[in-house]
Amino acid sequence: MGVKLKWLLGFLVQGLETLPDHRHVQPVCCQHNVMVQQLEVEADEMSSFVQKKANKPWIWIAMDTPRRQVMACHVGDRSRTSAKRLWAKIPEAYRQHGTLYTNQYVVYAGVIPAAQHRAISKLARQTNHIERFNNTLRQRVSRLVREALSFSKKLTNHIGAIKLFICHYNLTRAAA
């Protein structure tokens, strides 16, 4: 066929870099300061690794609960800085008027305003949709499977694969 593997990999990386930051999410608009529905967001973080188990980037995800669309994603460490970056990527209407459900991880409390934040235990089952999405992400993106032979060698490819899956997931959710 005449296509070299090096060119093909470069082409794929270029394609991953051009994926939209909005991830094809259809956020709720707040027109004329009137909200018709309550905005609910579930946020969570999950571990992954790049190249070796010691190199652990964390995947931070925020999901519009009623619509089941991933609205924000950040890959970084497990610090308050990463929580702030996830918060900054959430659409403005949700940051202003939404209720955010998270696990009881301490860094969320310093980032999300107290009036909007609900730190929930696993028994309350208010974060079951985001937990289910995390499982789906692990199943469908082979480099996130635990104890697997496939893994990312570069962080940019790791982020690109996650972003590609989320874009596809949101497009299928919007059509449903």
Where are the regions a protein language model picked out?
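Residue-level recognition of single "structural anchor" positions
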Residues: 1-176
